[in-house]
């Protein structure tokens, strides 16, 4: 399996796969469950980050099991989706952003495979946290389809499950954050540690607290995701055939890459 999709809020079924079966993978960090099917004659994995019925909150997702399972299945490329709030007035609800950097404001998560001992003490380079090759494919595909997708944006990850305060949003904006969400860290970190190419499609569902004129709710997030779901599916469907079979990026050469 070369490619896997990780679906965020509102994306519990990619709607593009045929001959689907469920696969449970046992890892040193617990079990991970994903759907495996076929698209364009190729086996593709789909993993709903929050579970099929959105029962797992962001701070309880077993990120290590999920990423380890993908590595065990020989996945090389990951296309992830995420619903986000926007702190940037240029990024409006309904827009897509192909993320290229992050800020980490999480607090309690286990965010590395390198815990010392057998894995050693490793300091992985994060100069390029997201795969530029996947990012380019996504941006070019969106342009071809006429889908509004911003090329680059900084994702600020908070602990959740509560939404952020207006003061926190002002801080994030001053530090350069364009988007705010609750799931991308440690997911992108772990993917990088095991040498996976990782691309994130962020869909703006609301303006962040203190910017939005209305109180925030998860129902609003799901409503925008539902309205824009076809564009998201089209973007993923059309991007997959354009992903080169040979990796020409440096993702597989991440310093201290762990062997599964």
Curated annotation (Swiss-Prot):
Pathway: Purine metabolism; purine nucleoside salvage. GO terms for molecular function: S-methyl-5-thioadenosine phosphorylase activity. InterPro entries: MTAP (IPR010044), Nucleoside_phosphorylase_d (IPR000845), Nucleoside_phosphorylase_sf (IPR035994). The keyword Amino-acid biosynthesis does not apply. Its EC number is 2.4.2.1. Keywords: Glycosyltransferase, Purine salvage, Transferase. GO terms for cellular component: cytosol. CDD domains: MTAP_SsMTAPII_like_MTIP. Substrate binds at residues 182, 206-208. The record marks 164, 218 as: Important for substrate specificity. Phosphate binds at residues 9, 49-50, 183. Although this enzyme belongs to the family of MTA phosphorylases based on sequence homology, it has been shown that conserved amino acid substitutions in the substrate binding pocket convert the substrate specificity of this enzyme from 6-aminopurines to 6-oxopurines. PANTHER family: S-METHYL-5'-THIOADENOSINE PHOSPHORYLASE. Purine nucleoside phosphorylase which is highly specific for 6-oxopurine nucleosides. Cleaves guanosine or inosine to respective bases and sugar-1-phosphate molecules. Involved in purine salvage. Homohexamer. Dimer of a homotrimer. Belongs to the PNP/MTAP phosphorylase family. MTAP subfamily. This is Probable 6-oxopurine nucleoside phosphorylase. It comes from Moorella thermoacetica (strain ATCC 39073 / JCM 9320).
């Amino acid at each position: 399996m070369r490619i896997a999709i990780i679906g965020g809020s509102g994306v519990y079924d990619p709607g593009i796969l045929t001959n689907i079966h469920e696969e449970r993978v046992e890892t040193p960090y617990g079990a991970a469950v994903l759907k495996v099917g076929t698209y364009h004659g190729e086996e593709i994995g789909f993993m709903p980050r929050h579970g099929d019925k959105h029962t797992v909150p962001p701070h309880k997702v077993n990120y290590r099991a999920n990423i380890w399972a993908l590595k065990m299945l020989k996945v090389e490329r990951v296309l992830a989706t995420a619903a986000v709030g926007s702190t940037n007035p240029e990024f409006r609800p309904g827009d897509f952003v192909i993320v290229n950097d992050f800020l980490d404001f999480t607090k309690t998560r286990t965010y590395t495979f390198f815990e010392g001992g057998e894995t050693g003490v490793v300091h992985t380079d994060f100069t390029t946290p997201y795969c530029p090759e996947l990012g380019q494919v996504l941006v070019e595909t969106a342009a071809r389809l006429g889908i509004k997708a911003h090329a680059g944006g900084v994702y600020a990850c908070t602990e959740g499950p509560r939404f952020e305060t207006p003061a926190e949003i002002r801080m994030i904006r001053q530090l350069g954050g364009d988007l705010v969400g609750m799931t991308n860290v440690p997911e992108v970190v772990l993917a990088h540690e095991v040498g996976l190419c990782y691309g994130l499609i962020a869909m703006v569902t609301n303006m962040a607290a203190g910017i939005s004129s209305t109180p925030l709710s998860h129902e609003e997030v799901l409503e925008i995701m539902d309205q824009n779901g076809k564009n998201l599916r089209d973007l993923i469907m059309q991007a997959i055939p354009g992903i080169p079979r040979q990796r020409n990026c440096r993702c597989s050469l991440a310093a201290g890459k762990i062997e599964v």
